A protein has these predicted regions:
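N-terminal intrinsically disordered, low-complexity tails enriched in polar/charged
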Residues: 1-5, 117-120
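Alpha-helical substrate-recognition element adjacent to the catalytic core
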Residues: 2-69
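C-terminal cap/substrate-recognition subdomain and adjoining C-terminal extension
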Residues: 43-120
Length: 120
């Protein structure tokens, strides 16, 4: 099963991104949420979205303000792609030569890139 990753703030908190995530889930793609948030704080808004997508809490990773590329590497996580709005995250994915492709959600063709990488 193909695995993909979504940032939350500025990405999966948007309705049209949530709709895309639902389409992927319905196509059999394994969807994860990776956020730089701290787990110890109130994340009710995040879990409201996660629950609405039908995802279990084990599909959510809190990096506690560690760069996601470093978190992925340290935890042996690999995804087909990670969708994010933070330009600094892109720098770190490239610096570490991550196998996970990172896609900028603010680019005009982010959805097409995601679909192409999944061969859907």
């Amino acid at each position: 099963m193909k695995k993909v990753s979504f940032d939350f703030d500025g990405t999966l908190d948007k309705k049209h991104i949530q709709q895309f995530a639902i389409e992927l889930i319905n196509s059999g793609v394994d969807v994860y949420v990776n956020t730089t948030r701290f787990k110890k704080f109130d994340n009710s808004d995040l879990f409201e979205v996660v629950n609405s997508l039908g995802l279990s809490s084990d599909k959510v990773n809190f990096t506690n303000h560690t760069w996601k590329a470093e978190f992925f590497e340290d935890n042996n996580l690999e995804f087909e792609w990670h969708l994010d709005d933070n330009y600094e995250e892109f720098f770190h994915f490239r610096r570490l030569k991550s196998k996970t492709k990172v896609i900028q959600v603010n680019s005009g063709n982010w959805k097409q890139k995601c679909i192409r990488l999944l061969n859907l």
